[in-house]
Swiss-Prot record:
UniProt keyword annotation of Isomerase present: yes
Name of the protein this chain belongs to: Triosephosphate isomerase
Keyword Cytoplasm listed: yes
Residues that coordinate or bind substrate: N8, W9, K10, G189, S227, G248, G249
Pfam families: TIM (PF00121)
Class of enzymatic activity (EC top level): isomerase
Main location: cytoplasm
Gene this protein is translated from: tpiA
Length: 269
């Protein structure tokens, strides 16, 4: 299975100059790294998700490369246009060249109180505009301590289950247009990292749950996110249940980001 490594830049970098510098560093490093050459790019798909403000510029810069560009969110209220101050629609995102979007990140759930109903609307709009969706799920520290990881995952994956129930016509496309990113909230940016065996078992549960929704979802891509870095990427990449990584802070430096990409490129061989 092809691996995926996705850099979620969040609200970074601060300036267009810094974005250009990061892109130049990233593209130069990719072109000079044998394992990341065009001939080997099918082993690991690289994608970056800049802020809305930089999305068009980054998408344009990456147009003739193997690196994909994603948004970090889409509007829940309209797939196209409307009086929704501050929102960007899926159509607008697709129009500037992005082909994917992240949805359901824990920071969006926490700071913007995003519910399952909201996420269902966003996912519907994204798929309507032919955007792929990286759907983030994961438990908090309190839920982990209470051994509620699997029930929490069930409740969050209910968005996918409801999507299929309400729009069965999308089922066949989800195997290539939906990626699940398991990000335990307590591990994001904290330096705390679950064991590889814990992540592997959780990924197996996610895959089994999705397969229960529809036979065509039996081989879904499931990524891990949460303090993934150059030092621990090899151990995650070696596990067949872990198909890649959603990377936060480590994606803001080309060297550390590409070390993770290289690890998963080797792991998918």
């Amino acid at each position: 299975m092809q691996a995926w490594v996705i850099g979620n830049w969040k609200q970074n970098p601060a300036t267009s100059h810094d974005v250009d510098a990061l892109l130049n560093e990233l593209c130069t490093a990719i072109s000079t790294t044998k394992q990341l050459s065009h001939n080997n790019s099918t082993r690991c798909q690289i994608m970056v998700a800049p802020s809305f403000l930089h999305l068009a510029a980054v998408s344009s810069r990456l147009k003739d490369t193997s690196v994909l560009c994603a948004a970090q969110d889409v509007s829940a209220y309209s797939a196209s246009v409307g009086a929704y101050t501050g929102d960007c629609s899926a159509q607008q995102i697709a129009d500037v060249g992005a082909t994917w979007t992240i949805l359901g990140h824990s920071e969006r759930r926490q700071y913007h109180q995003e519910s399952n109903d909201t996420l269902l609307q966003k996912m519907t709009h994204a798929l309507t505009q032919e955007l792929g969706v990286v759907f983030c799920i994961g438990e908090t520290q309190a839920q982990y301590d209470a051994k509620q990881t699997l029930p929490v995952i069930d409740s969050q994956l209910a968005v996918v289950k409801k999507l299929i129930a309400e729009q069965p016509e999308v089922i066949d496309s989800l195997s290539t247009r939906l990626i699940i990113a398991y990000e335990p909230v307590w591990a994001i940016g904290t330096g705390k990292v679950p064991t590889v065996s814990e992540v592997s078992a959780t990924h197996q549960y996610i895959k089994q749950t999705l397969a229960g929704f529809a036979d065509s979802l039996s081989n879904m891509t499931v990524l891990y996110g949460g303090s993934v870095n150059a030092d621990n990427a090899d151990s995650f990449a070696a596990d067949p249940m872990i198909h890649g990584a959603l990377v936060g802070g480590a994606s803001l430096k080309a060297e550390s980001f590409l070390a993770i990409v290289t690890a998963f490129s080797k792991g998918s061989m």
